[in-house]
Amino acid sequence: MGIEAAAVGGTSPSGSPEGTITLCTGCVEGRPLRGDVHGSTNLPLPDRGGAQSWPAQRTQEHGAAAIRASRGNAVRGLHRRQFLAVTAALLGAPAVTSAVQAAKQVRIGVLAIPSAPQFAPRTQALRAGLRDLGYIEGKNLIIEFRSAEGQYERLAGLAVELIGEKVDVIVTAGTPAIRAAKQATKTVPIVIAAVGDAVAGGLVASLTTPGGNVTGATYFAPELAAKQLELLKQSVPHTSGVAVVMNPNNPAMGPTLHAVEAAGASLKLDLEQVGVRHRDDFHGAFDMIIRRRSRAVLIVDDPITIYNARALADLALQHRLASAGFIEYAEAGGLIGYGVNLTAMWRRAAYFVDRILRGVNAGEIPMERAMKFDLVINRKTAIAIGVAIDPSTLLRADRVIE
């Protein structure tokens, strides 16, 4: 099931124009009754009301037929010329637009935290979204890709490097990368493909009016993490302790941990934070979890955990631990996955890029909040670790991996 993006204000989630094109059909003697052409717009067109009528011309009986015939011929001739002119203009417009688009070479910068192979599904999704809107690599599009290879400290330099490439827009995701891009430029537009909480992270002023040079989409990670913990408790109801695997280097982790702690207290769970800053920390983290006798693990959303989902899922399976995290985590072998489709969000980022390239200020484009969340249960993993998933949870699942 795909992602549904709900605009906070002003635009349709699909990105399609809500207005309609209305041609002047009541022009007489060169004077339009209600205006010539209304172009497409993202705001509804004004109510045009009913068709405007205009008074009949009174003529004397003498010579009326001849006068009407003469005037009718003149008007019909004028209408024909206007019709041909409008038709020619409409037929020619796509060609002109295409020529302009072809002439302009668009340069998009992509700033990624993980390596290029790990990030490939996201960049492919962005390319597909841009292609749908007429931006094609090798024709009118250049994508400048920069990867920090999982090292947050490299992000600032890579962002500056993209600015040096004279990119028209930067597309990125994750609080550390977004902050690096914001520090590198106050003028080049930045599109957030996905982030846990754009407002709490101090990335935008508000969802309706982001401000500055930033716009994009958010999915509110704190609420997701709390729900993941709840689902984990439902799956292993006798568990009293849960290890929370998180990246302490992520500056946006605070609100998520607060939400998890509140959910843990409500569920009467003892939570223990286990920090992982790099992939090399994974084995040590799980050794610590086993020593402390935790039987369940919550994997908190972070670029380090998202792009190393399989390694984490393998360790949880190896130690027969019930675990929950984001969708990709369950797909990689974790027990439970709940969240948004991040790949779909990267494809949606093309919509924001297109609006910016058409002249709209990034800070004036409302942020979108992901409103569609999927539940994925890995039944194969449940059988392997000896966990019986509650039938009601299976019925609620959007997808069950057998």
What are these regions, as identified by a protein language model?
Residues 1-402:
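Short hydrophobic alpha-helices and adjacent helix-cap/hinge residues
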